[in-house]
Amino acid sequence: MRQMIVGNWKMNGLGAPSRDLVGEIAEGLATIPSPPQVVVCPPFTQLAGIGPLLKGSGIALGAQDCHQAASGAHTGDISAAMLADLGVEYVVLGHSERRRDHGELDETVREKTQTALAAGLTPIVCIGETGDQKASGESRDAIGWQIQGSLPDGFSGVVAYEPVWAIGSGNPAASQDIADMMGFIRAELVRQFGAAGKTIRILYGGSVNGRDAASILPIAEVGGALVGSASLQADTFLPIVRAAVDL
């Protein structure tokens, strides 16, 4: 299975600079033999403009959220079907910033995941413990409950482990900590989903950069990376993509 590198642009990117960025990423990707799967997740406002630019580039289009309802009276929200209509293939759900800023619960993430799957999107469901949970030795309990609460029966998407305390810090988790948690997450997926849990891709996220990607991506059970700030420039994103080649 090829590695997957997902660029989460968060609330960044205006029209022309966003189009320039995907052009630079596409140019760089074209020079990489047997590249990994690459997904870019711009803000909603850039999806329609960027989608056509990705055709034939090997880069898939992703979004950063969707509403749990298929349609209806939800002012300001975006449905999974609307995303699919724009050519979106992936959607990030349950990111810690959504949970923090919008009070999203595991139940909400689960409902959004079901809606995304029904619309033909591949959900990338984020899980991760806080600094306080890590300090008190509750990391595994927190992750276990998130897996149980956020992933619906028959889940067939991607899981992204992002320790909340590492996001935006500039310092990813230590390799041994990542390895330990990845092993635990895999065991929990198998416990919850049986044999299907063995094939669910797990990404690592949390201050991933070109310097550390080469040591993170080869860790057992790591199937790729969910990249935040380093995805906002081609010269910081492409080194992560290159680190995933041949893994």
UniProtKB/Swiss-Prot annotation:
Entry-linked Pfam families: TIM (PF00121)
Catalytic activity: D-glyceraldehyde 3-phosphate = dihydroxyacetone phosphate
Keywords of this entry: Cytoplasm, Gluconeogenesis, Glycolysis, Isomerase
Catalytic-site annotation from UniProt: H95, E162
Annotated binding of substrate, by residue: N8, W9, K10, G168, S207
InterPro entries per record: Aldolase_TIM, TIM_sf, TrioseP_Isoase_bac/euk, Triosephosphate_isomerase, Triosephosphate_isomerase_AS
EC number: 5.3.1.1
Tree of life domain: Bacteria
GO terms under biological process: gluconeogenesis; glyceraldehyde-3-phosphate biosynthetic process; glycerol catabolic process; glycolytic process
Pathways involved: Carbohydrate biosynthesis; gluconeogenesis; Carbohydrate degradation; glycolysis; D-glyceraldehyde 3-phosphate from glycerone phosphate: step 1/1
Localization in the cell: Cytoplasm
Entries under NCBIfam families matching the protein: tim
Annotated family: Belongs to the triosephosphate isomerase family.
Function: Involved in the gluconeogenesis. Catalyzes stereospecifically the conversion of dihydroxyacetone phosphate (DHAP) to D-glyceraldehyde-3-phosphate (G3P).
Subunit structure comment from the entry: Homodimer.
Protein name: Triosephosphate isomerase
